[in-house]
Amino acid sequence: LIRKHNLFAKIDLIIGLPGENLSDIENTLEYMMETVRFGQGHLLCFHVMRGLPGTELLEIAREFNMTFSSKNEPHEFMKSPDLPRKDMLKCLRRTAVVFRLTNHRGWSRREFISENKSNDVNIRDSFFKTREKLNLTNIELVDQLVEGLLDHLKERNSWFVQPDFPFAETWWWNHSAFEVRDKWIIEYLGNLKPQQLSA
């Protein structure tokens, strides 16, 4: 429908639902990037699963042996047998990059967060041009951006590069556009060559 009718859409996704694993989240991110590829405006929201006390969802989460912590953000999902912490961290970094790419100027003609309008879709165009040139999936290219950002943001000691990526959701909502400039994204994508790709 988004593509067919050129709709403005707000889409909410929760990362770490009971029973969800790395492959499930990867497939969802891949699908959503294709879904918002052609829209004129959208907000692709990502939230980390919260184990709120007294909720039915928390009871279901317990059946899946899910672990939550309020160390950084309230009742935040940390890990489960289906999604070990290492896999969750991979999901968080991928999600942060997808959020940064798709929710700010340069992807669609209307920035849903600020309501700004622009004809600038250079990030979207660069992303898909690079994806096609390198014959990658959306998430394979996102993984290349994650690797680049781990190096690029190291000097500023961004939350993104810290081993446990604390405050991940806060980072993608409030810090990603300031720490990851459009110019860096476009240059990084433009400089990727097939022989440089990390496994």
Segments from the language model and where they lie:
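Radical SAM enzyme core and accessory elements
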Residues: 78, 85-199
